[in-house]
Amino acid sequence: SLGSLMAVSPTVRAAVVRWVTEWYETHIVYRYSGEQITGEMPQYEITDLPEGYAEDERVNWPSYVSVVYQNKDTGKTIYLDCTYMQQGSASDYVTDGVEVVSVIVNGFSGQLFLTDDWENKWNTITWIDAERNLQFEIDANVNRDVILHMAESVSLVKTEK
């Protein structure tokens, strides 16, 4: 069985277990154990943004991409982060004062971190695409339905050659 193989073979276990989720009283930590990234980070975008938002900035690091969307009228910002899950990196989410809800985003498991005051504090959604070894996160001053809809609209950027 797979369980027996994982117990006997560290190689099989490493290929199967790319991250561990650790739940604490005030936060959740995702610890990664994947290989170092080779090549460039894939570029993703939110394809269905709330009205008034447009991409303002894109920050590219070897294993991390952050896309900033700005609403010039309201001054509000939406962040889309994509992290390559590799050894030595982790993501930490504060759970103090928020409701944590398990969600499915396009078939992938994740968590939604909801605040009561989403107009002034960010709601956050995160999900993991284990096949591509990526963790996604959106932070925004929007309600539960809107942030989930945005997450479901995240797609690879279409590049023209």
Regions inferred by a protein language model and the residue ranges of each:
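Membrane-interface helical sensory segment of bacterial ECF anti-sigma factor regulators
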Residues: 1-32
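Residue-level marker of positions within ordered structural domains that often coincide
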Residues: 21, 58, 159
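Short glycine-rich, low-complexity/disordered patches
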Residues: 29-36, 160-161
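Short, solvent-exposed recognition patches
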Residues: 36-131
